[in-house]
Amino acid sequence: MATILQNLPIGQKVGIAFSGGLDTSAALHWMKLKGAIPYAYTANLGQPDEPDYEDIPRKAMQYGAEQARLIDCRSQLAAEGLAALQAGAFHITTAGVTYFNTTPLGRAVTGTMLVAAMKEDDVNIWGDGSTYKGNDIERFYRYGLLTNPSLKIYKPWLDQLFIDELGGRAEMSEFMTQAGFGYKMSAEKAYSTDSNMLGATHEAKDLEHLSSGMKIVNPIMGVAFWKDEVEVKREEVTVRFEEGRPVALNGVEYPDLVELILEANRIGGRHGLGMSDQIENRIIEAKSRGIYEAPGLALLFIAYERLVTGIHNEDTIEQYRDSGRRLGRLLYQGRWFDSQAIMLRETAQRWVASAITGEVTIELRRGNDYSILNTESANLTYQPERLSMEKVEGAFTPLDRIGQLTMRNLDIVDTRAKLGIYAKSGVLSLGTGGDLLNLTGKAAE
């Protein structure tokens, strides 16, 4: 039997990741009418734009679900978000502004926890709303099969019969209205939005055009800081970490990581912190564009990285960042629980994050404009007295530096010899002054 089912499995249990929106509502009711036995599963990821989670399973039952469950995924999402932060698992940046992989983190949690819940109900066929051109179809495929090796995939949006009968939002809205549900299609936005407690993604439609900028987006986790009429006051915030875990904001301790992240979102959101505009490579290698929000993670990451640079040495920081970029890409590809990803993140958690204890005070202004005002940690290896020109005990002397510089003569001689070889081969031309070294020939092209 194929893993991916192209036709509706009549008479069988089919689990659907149910959001309560038009697409999944129409799909669920359609599957019921066609003879399947739909089970609805909704993930509570702390979405900032979801007003009433409890109402979603009730809707699913009205539309024909045999059973509807609400799965609280917030604690697991917070834990995975912290692991990503500790490992610096963020590979998409533009001019130093970071995308915090919040959608891939949400998919890792949703794809495992919902399928685990389905397995409890003896539901071994899963459907969701991901499209065939996107990243999510592969992420959910991987996480689903990792959780339940017997899982089969049925997506209404890959079923030609469903597409023929309910191919667009207008058709879905009419279908639900005729069924007696009085479903009103919401006003069409200029872009689509997907969110969870860690961040929001805005993409597609008008945002596919690079001439449409961030200003067409209505933020859901913070303020539109680019608008002059939006008042944004300067604010100082102190973030405290203990052994790599954020534990306090402005002196208030948060034993519950979920509550700390929500408060960090509120603080960062008041300034529009963490918004970014990124061009990225999807899993299929086609480029896409997204506008992202992550006010809380951005705030925590500023403080975390400040402590990383003050506590660890250069080689450790280099390895942390190189490994973080590799791990970020694995996370993006839906491989967060693969062995190579676990190896990278647990190494960072054990040898980098465990030493991160201290407090960082930050002044937030508009958007990603901020200043670090103070850094305190008992673990700091930053010690200004080591570089003091005053006489201090334990400092190195001029004679020590003379010896160190003399040892550099060996590699300087080697470098000079290499440059001579390159000049003889025509790769370099030796001139004078500012033109001392110039690439020539093919190397300059």
UniProtKB/Swiss-Prot annotation:
Belongs to the argininosuccinate synthase family. Type 2 subfamily. L-aspartate binds at T131, N135, D136. GO terms for biological process: argininosuccinate metabolic process; L-arginine biosynthetic process; urea cycle. The keyword Amino-acid biosynthesis applies. This is Argininosuccinate synthase. InterPro entries: Arg_succ_synth_type2_subfam, Arginosuc_syn_C, Arginosuc_syn_N, Arginosuc_synth, Arginosuc_synth_CS, Arginosuc_synth_type_1_subfam, AS_cat/multimer_dom_body, AS_multimer_C_tail. Its EC number is 6.3.4.5. Homotetramer. NCBIfam families: argG, PRK05370.1. ATP binds at A17, F18, S19, G20, G21, L22, D23, T24, S25, A43, G129, T131, D136, D194. L-citrulline binds at Y99, N135, R139, S192, T201, E203, E280. The gene is argG. The keyword ATP-binding applies. It catalyses: L-citrulline + L-aspartate + ATP = 2-(N(omega)-L-arginino)succinate + AMP + diphosphate + H(+).
